[in-house]
UniProtKB/Swiss-Prot annotation:
Belongs to the ATPase C chain family. It comes from the Bacteria. Keywords: ATP synthesis, Cell membrane, CF(0), Hydrogen ion transport, Ion transport, Lipid-binding, Membrane, Sodium, Sodium transport, Transmembrane, Transmembrane helix, Transport. One of its GO terms (molecular function) is lipid binding. F-type ATPases have 2 components, F(1) - the catalytic core - and F(0) - the membrane sodium channel. F(1) has five subunits: alpha(3), beta(3), gamma(1), delta(1), epsilon(1). F(0) has three main subunits: a(1), b(2) and c(10-14). The alpha and beta chains form an alternating ring which encloses part of the gamma chain. F(1) is attached to F(0) by a central stalk formed by the gamma and epsilon chains, while a peripheral stalk is formed by the delta and b chains. GO terms for cellular component: plasma membrane; proton-transporting ATP synthase complex; proton-transporting two-sector ATPase complex, proton-transporting domain. The chain crosses the membrane at residues 9-29, 68-88. SUPFAM superfamilies: F1F0 ATP synthase subunit C. This is ATP synthase subunit c, sodium ion specific. It is found in: Cell membrane. F(1)F(0) ATP synthase produces ATP from ADP in the presence of a proton or sodium gradient. F-type ATPases consist of two structural domains, F(1) containing the extramembraneous catalytic core and F(0) containing the membrane sodium channel, linked together by a central stalk and a peripheral stalk. During catalysis, ATP synthesis in the catalytic domain of F(1) is coupled via a rotary mechanism of the central stalk subunits to sodium translocation. Key component of the F(0) channel; it plays a direct role in translocation across the membrane. A homomeric c-ring of between 10-14 subunits forms the central stalk rotor element with the F(1) delta and epsilon subunits.
């Protein structure tokens, strides 16, 4: 009976951890929206620098999005390929 309880606790903690990992995806979304807004403001002020501004914004958003992708991968691992259940035996 103790093993069933242990697996239940591990699975519940993994679900909570996956939820926390997905909450971490909020940060990149807010940051990307802020960066896009500032890029639009910059293009409105200096239309001749549009190419440089857009390329810099896209590079920054690609780097910021990697955080969201990592949190998604961690959540999927915790939910579907949980390494901690195998440690219980």
């Amino acid at each position: 009976m103790d093993m069933v309880l242990a697996k239940t606790v591990v699975l519940a903690a993994s679900a909570v951890g996956a939820g926390a990992a997905m909450i971490a995806g909020i940060g990149p979304g807010v940051g990307q929206g802020y960066a896009a807004g500032k890029a639009v403001e910059s293009v409105a002020r200096q239309p001749e620098a549009k190419g440089d501004i857009i390329s810099t914004m896209v590079l920054g958003q690609a780097i910021a999005e990697s955080t969201g992708i990592y949190s998604l991968v961690i959540a999927l691992i915790l939910l579907y390929a949980n390494p901690f259940v195998g440690l219980l035996g």
